[in-house]
Amino acid sequence: DISDFYNQDLTNVELVGVLDFWGRFFFHNLHSHKTFDYLNSGVLLLNMAEIKKTRLFAKVREKMSDKKMLLPDQSALNKLATEKRIAPRCYNEQYRLHPDTKIQHFTTSFRFKPYFHTLTVKPWDVERVHSVLKLHEYDDLLKQYTELKPLLKQH
């Protein structure tokens, strides 16, 4: 249940998100001297009225067209959002499933053994969700997806 996350008061807040697992170590807003403020853009609660008022998305589009960035949408949002709120990890779990996880983000991660490399497993890649991530918590949902997938191709 994510109703607490979704129904929170957004007065004077542009967006709410969870700290990026890896970005919290590498990306910081040095101009505002905030160290742990780099949000992952995979799960965001957006206050569209405030975003229109501050023109955040227009500024983000401009920044992305003017400057090359790693993770351009996420980096620009983090750099330009002036009023953001940090939500608990459980609303965008990017690393490992925990008992309190409400939303798990299937994101690219880093692996260090047997050598440094990135690992990307998409949630619809059922075989790799099982074999690589060793996740079986979503088997009921993945079974439904597998049954419905052929119907999607018909339309």
What are these regions (language model features)?
Residues 41, 46-155:
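A glycosyltransferase accessory/donor-loop signature
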Residues 9-10, 37-38, 96-98:
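Extracellular/periplasmic catalytic domains that process cell-envelope and extracellular macromolecules
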Residues 23-24, 97:
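Short, surface-exposed recognition loops and adjoining beta-strand edges that mediate ligand/DNA contacts
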Residues 1-4, 27, 55, 114-116:
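Short glycine-/acidic-enriched loop or helix-start segments at secondary-structure transitions
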Residues 28-34:
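Short, P/G- and charge-enriched loop/turn segments at secondary-structure junctions
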